[in-house]
Amino acid sequence: MSLNDDPRRYEHLSRIRLEDPEAVARAAATRRRHPGLKHGVQNFIVAADHPARGALSVGPEPMAMADRRDLLDRLQIALANPAVDGILASPDIMDDLLLLGALDGKLIFGSMNRGGLAGLVNEFDDRFTGHTAAALQALGADGGKMLTRICLGDPDTVATLEATAKAIDSLAERKLIAMVEPFLSVRDAHGKVRNDLRADAVIKSVGIAEGLGSTSAYTWMKLPVVADMERVMASTTLPTVLLGGDPDGSQDEVFASWQAALALPGVRGLTVGRTLLYPHDGDVAGAVATAASLLNNAGPATGSATGPAAGEPASSDRIPVKVSE
């Protein structure tokens, strides 16, 4: 990927933040809005809220997302593609992109709970430390996203579920979308949080998540692509976007799994980040263009959509898992 390597290329953002912090609110108020969501049109949202949870790794590179200038470069390349409908980001990244004028005509989803830091001793106590519903309304955002990891063996799960339900209600009161990303999760033998990606586990997490809050009128699901995806999508009537997660396997395998899943009823599109922002070959524009070409192009589903994170067939005794997003 060919990028501008001038270390001062974003120095103006620091200057604006120092001298004119109200510029963020003005940029949000004056930006051109997305024309709106329509049934039958799948949407493409780029996700960039991982650093706020201390999750900087991509594949084997533990600090891949550490350089903010590099990340902003990659995000601007992705957002420049007219097929990309919007952004999902933490407040710091969202504000940078607003100041850069990169969000004109885009959907905006804020990341609400980043308190469950990767590796934290009580990681399942995933507190709402990011965007609030009120802040998202003030930004003119379209909704908020919440990671909802459910660990049946951890008492902090109940507090996270309660906080998620309250956030869903707060968003719904403002007619904003609640994008809920549920997982059944466990700690492995080394104490690392991992998500259970068997279809039955994903289906159970969906059942729990879609029942949160006093209304589901504005609730969406954000789900992984796993083996037996038809059964997963049969478990909900809520609009659903597909997440990418930390890429493993070849890019061709990842894209093929997305294409199959995008053909299923109820799937509204993609909300992915690291797979496209940090592709194996470094070609961000190419990866984004390929992903965009999958939207609305898939024919009727004829078999299982097998995601790259699924690991073993559904009949295997081995539990396919992936580190949390």
Model-derived regions: residue spans:
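Catalytic-face loop-and-helix region of soluble metabolic enzyme cores
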Residues: 224-300, 317-324
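Generic structural "secondary-structure junction" signal
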Residues: 39, 185, 278-279
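A generic structural signal for short coil/turn motifs at secondary-structure boundaries
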Residues: 55-56, 118-121, 153-157, 278-280
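Intrinsically disordered, low-complexity terminal tails and inter-domain linkers enriched
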Residues: 300-318
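Alpha/beta enzyme core
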Residues: 60-82, 94, 99, 113-116, ...
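Anionic group-transfer/hydrolysis microenvironments
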Residues: 49-51, 183, 224, 275
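Alpha/beta catalytic barrel-like cores
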Residues: 1-117, 124-125, 265-268, 300, ...
